[in-house]
């Protein structure tokens, strides 16, 4: 039973609202009241500035990495033959925690940065490709949501191309769907031409 408690820890760590903590502790600001009202790195940059945005990004990516690591530890302790499945479960629980945080009444962020941390651990080559595409799309359009959806769509495609194990490919597909579904409101605003670009705003 003990090893599987680490998977529960992965969910709890994923649930930690990094953006909310950075905003409230260091800036006396609740990100949910400004900009896109999201607690992710993009809105942290938009409202609080680059250093805050970078801190939130690193923390959220770290949650994904740590979730997979805890899953790997669980597998190594319980049954090494199941390690890859435990790694995926740990990452998925961290992603679910980020998107449905126990500390935020089961609400949360979009899951992009945490998902990036997960695939960084599971599939670093694919992560480099996906991150490059994200940078290009965001650099050209200044629309983080568009870059995030494009990157999410690319995850299962690159995993298929590089012949990742089926459990990893299936996870990549599920994670991509979670990220895209979490961006449904952004997609509607994109179609309406109302989506916020990644630029600083003045708090009122």
Language-model features: locations:
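Loop-to-transmembrane alpha-helix initiation sites
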Residues: 128, 144-151, 164-175
């Amino acid at each position: 039973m003990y090893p599987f408690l680490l998977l529960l820890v992965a969910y709890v760590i994923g649930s930690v609202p990094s953006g909310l903590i950075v905003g409230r502790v260091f800036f006396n600001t609740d990100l949910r009241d400004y900009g896109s009202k999201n607690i992710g790195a993009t809105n942290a940059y938009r409202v609080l500035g680059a250093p805050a945005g970078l801190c939130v990004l690193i923390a959220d990516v770290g949650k994904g990495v740590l979730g997979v690591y805890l899953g790997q530890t669980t597998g190594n302790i319980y049954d090494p033959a199941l390690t890859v499945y435990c790694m995926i479960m740990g990452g998925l629980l961290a992603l679910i925690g980020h998107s449905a945080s126990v500390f935020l009444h089961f609400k949360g962020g979009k899951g992009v940065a945490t998902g990036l941390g997960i695939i960084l651990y599971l599939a670093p080559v694919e992560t480099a490709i996906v991150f490059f595409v994200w940078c290009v799309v965001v650099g050209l359009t200044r629309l983080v949501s568009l870059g995030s959806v494009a990157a999410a769509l690319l995850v299962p495609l690159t995993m298929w191309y590089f012949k990742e194990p089926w459990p990893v490919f299936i996870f990549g597909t599920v994670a991509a769907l979670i990220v895209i579904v979490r961006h449904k409101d952004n997609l509607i605003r994109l179609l309406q031409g109302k989506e916020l670009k990644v630029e600083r705003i003045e708090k009122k």
